[in-house]
Amino acid sequence: MNIISMQTQKSPMYLKAITLRDYSDVHSVRDDIKKGMILVLRVTPLAQKNVDELRKAVEEIYSIAKSADADIARLGEERIIVTPVGVKIWRAEYDLK
């Protein structure tokens, strides 16, 4: 098998943007994490609605991500990113040598 055929057989990785409006949205986020998707979660609508519900949702998503060996981080004030195994989120404290 040559390199080109190996690349074409690899399944694509998808990036999905999701707006969290309610705690129940965590279920679809869980499914997408298990599928190995890169997720950009917009949390502002849920934050405006109920901060305690947002905190609970973020804690649950964090737990799901860690159990799937995914990486998770905040992107500014309004978003969270979740990446699958093999995709790490750069943080300022990392040494990229």
Language model region names:
Residues 1-3, 64-97:
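Helix-rich interaction surfaces within compact, conserved domain-sized segments
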Residues 1-35:
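N-terminal intrinsically disordered, cationic/polar leader segments
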Residues 15-19, 46-53:
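Flexible beta-alpha connector loops of hexameric P-loop NTPases
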Residues 33-46:
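Short glycine-rich, basic-tinged beta-strand/loop micro-motifs
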Residues 55-58:
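Charged helix-capping and loop-helix junction motifs
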Residues 61:
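Residue-level signature of catalytic and energy-coupling elements of molecular machines
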